[in-house]
Regions:
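A general, composition-driven signal for non-globular sequence regions
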Residues: 1, 41-42, 46-48, 94, ...
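Catalytic core of non-heme Fe(II) oxygenases with the double-stranded beta-helix
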Residues: 61, 68-190
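Non-heme Fe(II)/2-oxoglutarate
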Residues: 2-85
């Protein structure tokens, strides 16, 4: 008999997801790819880029050989964290996204799973690409118990949580906050 207890309302933090050098490289790559107003899926099911809910900029990291290492890190850590905390049926990852929050830019309280059709977003991962001294205020806030919460603002640290847990990105009042976001998917919930 296993002593496993599923932690469906817990967020897990890994403080060593990416190195500072990798974080800076991804930020530079995002600038080259091109940052645009981040889209948001509205309640009516339409994707919009003009919204008071989400005011940051974003770019997508392609599934390309150049980023195989990054997708590998996310998949490997997700496998470990999922086995330890959730044991969700995760079978893939959506295209990664880099977000840039300039002063007063935010993403209000929201969930990352909007459909019951497969593939369903099951886990969300947010990795800090900025050092804590590069911005004031702002940051990820999750409506869940967070293990190792004291590390959540460190550059290269990542936070995993179920995609159905409400969360938000608070606006920095000074500086710029960069993050990498991953959505891990799987078949419909049973």
């Amino acid at each position: 008999m296993s002593n496993f207890k599923q932690k469906v309302l817990t967020a897990a933090v890994d403080r060593y997801v990416l190195t500072p050098t990798q974080c800076m490289m991804l930020r530079q790559d995002a600038e080259v790819i091109g940052m645009k107003r981040a889209p948001v899926l509205a309640k009516d099911g339409v994707t919009r880029t003009v919204s008071r809910t989400r005011t940051c900029t974003s770019c997508w990291i392609p599934f390309a050989p150049h980023y195989k290492w990054l997708y590998g890190i996310i998949n490997e850590l997700t496998e470990q964290i999922n086995a330890e905390h959730y044991r969700f049926d995760v079978t893939g990852v959506q295209q990664l996204q880099i977000l840039r929050y300039s002063p007063l830019q935010k993403f209000r309280w929201h969930w990352d799973c909007y459909t019951s059709e497969a593939p369903v977003r099951k886990l969300t991962a947010v990795v800090n690409l900025s050092a804590p001294n590069e911005y004031l205020g702002g940051g990820l806030q999750v409506k869940a118990d967070i293990e190792n919460v004291r590390f959540i603002r460190e550059q290269g640290a990542g936070c995993w949580f179920p995609s159905y847990v409400e969360h938000r990105a608070r606006a920095p009042i000074w500086g710029t906050r960069w993050v990498l976001v991953a959505w891990l998917t799987g078949p419909a919930w049973r």
